[in-house]
């Protein structure tokens, strides 16, 4: 398999709290668990990472995937002996993952519980949940990195010195689809439904940036919903009344995404759809939403999709699925892309560990911000991990794709 910088394509460790025998002596100003002269959560033989993510509730599917993917990656790495760090020590990677049910208060509580025993927080899903402890992590100088939120604040070093996002920003995604639509040269009327928070606002901002000044694109109507809403039928009904031929649906809640697709069909409104990368799963959303009824469903991606015929037999995908089954007890092809994303996060962390010269959070952050053109496993051609550009997450390039009834394929044009 083609990999850069000799990363192992294999998987992880414990899903929830792991009992760890700590070695070495912690510094007086650090919590227990530090290596000699190092930071909390790292010894001469182990490094412990913390994750707070939804493992129950409406976003449990994606949240469970955030743990499974990184667990799968480091499972294989640990089985092979661990990661050789830049300080010459070989360490195994352990994790403590707690359920926040997509509740910001629970996420903050989880962070407070974990911060004294982990080296860094990573991979957690959600904008409101990650925001809930961002300021505390800065104050405590605990890295909160490679998190699954497209909120650009996590990639701005002046505002978030201890943070870095992993997935493309919401603005990146919305702009990519807008550019494709403008490039069609055909007139399009667009209906917009967005989540009434930073998530939805980011997608709409990127989309409007791309269509600014384009004479062929008209926004017919724009509505919002709350992340706590249990139905968006009223909004879909209003938007259907516009007769728009494109539906831009900036939605993060899986049940609502399915219901939106279903409701539009009940109203006999069949526009082309745009869905965000985290709510565009063929198996979990498009199939139950009967998305094949629409002339086109578009999303963006930077990862290979195991269900797609285009990647049947792909070595990255084959190894990934094997690791998921063996090390994460996840036997089926994942319904959510978060499994692939967190697998990539594992590979990125391995690269960072290999280049950090001291067992400290400071050395970790320095190494983290110097990853360039890393071809992590499962990345689509044309994408890479690059952490050197301030204001951008680790992955900032996306490929617009179109649903073909089974999976996605690259959309060269709209239509």
Predicted regions and their residues:
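Extracellular/periplasmic periplasmic-binding protein-like sensory domains
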Residues: 264-342, 409
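C-terminal motif of bacterial Sec signal peptides marking the signal peptidase cleavage site
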Residues: 21-24
């Amino acid at each position: 398999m083609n990999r850069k910088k000799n990363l192992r394509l294999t998987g992880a460790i414990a899903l929830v709290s792991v009992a760890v025998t700590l070695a070495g002596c912690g510094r007086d100003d650090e919590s227990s668990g530090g290596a000699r002269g190092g930071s909390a959560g790292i010894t001469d033989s182990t490094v412990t990472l913390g994750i707070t993510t939804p493992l129950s509730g409406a976003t449990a599917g994606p949240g469970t995937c955030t743990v499974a993917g990184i667990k799968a990656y480091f499972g294989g790495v640990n089985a092979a002996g661990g990661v050789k760090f830049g300080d010459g020590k070989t360490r195994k990677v352990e994790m403590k993952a707690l359920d926040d049910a997509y509740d910001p208060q629970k996420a903050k509580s989880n962070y407070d519980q974990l911060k004294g025993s982990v080296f860094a927080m990573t991979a957690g899903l959600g904008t409101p949940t990650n925001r809930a402890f961002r300021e505390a992590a800065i104050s405590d100088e605990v890295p909160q990195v490679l998190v699954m939120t497209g909120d650009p604040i996590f990639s701005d070093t002046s505002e978030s010195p201890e943070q870095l996002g992993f997935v493309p920003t919401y603005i990146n995604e919305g702009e990519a689809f807008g550019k494709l639509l403008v490039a069609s040269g055909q007139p399009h009327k667009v209906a917009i439904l967005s989540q009434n928070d930073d998530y939805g606002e980011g997608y709409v901002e990127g989309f409007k940036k791309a269509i600014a000044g384009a004479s062929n694109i008209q926004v017919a109507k724009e509505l919002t919903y709350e992340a706590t809403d249990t139905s968006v039928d009223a909004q879909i009904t209003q938007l259907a009344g516009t007769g728009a031929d494109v539906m831009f649906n900036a939605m993060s809640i899986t049940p609502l995404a399915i219901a939106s697709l279903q409701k539009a069909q009940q109203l006999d409104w069949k526009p082309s759809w745009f869905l965000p990368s985290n709510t565009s799963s063929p198996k979990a959303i498009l199939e139950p939403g009967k998305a094949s009824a629409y002339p086109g469903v578009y999303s963006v991606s930077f990862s290979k999709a195991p269900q797609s015929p285009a990647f049947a037999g792909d070595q990255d995908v084959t190894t990934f699925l094997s690791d998921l089954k063996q090390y994460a007890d996840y036997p089926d092809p994942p319904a959510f892309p978060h499994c692939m994303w967190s697998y990539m996060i594992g590979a990125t962390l391995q690269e960072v560990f290999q280049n950090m010269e001291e067992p400290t959070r400071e050395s970790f952050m320095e190494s983290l911000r110097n990853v360039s053109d890393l071809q992590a496993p499962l990345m689509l051609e044309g994408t890479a991990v690059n952490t050197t550009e301030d204001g951008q997450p680790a992955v900032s390039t996306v490929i617009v794709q179109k649903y073909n009834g089974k999976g996605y394929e690259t959309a060269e044009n709209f239509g």
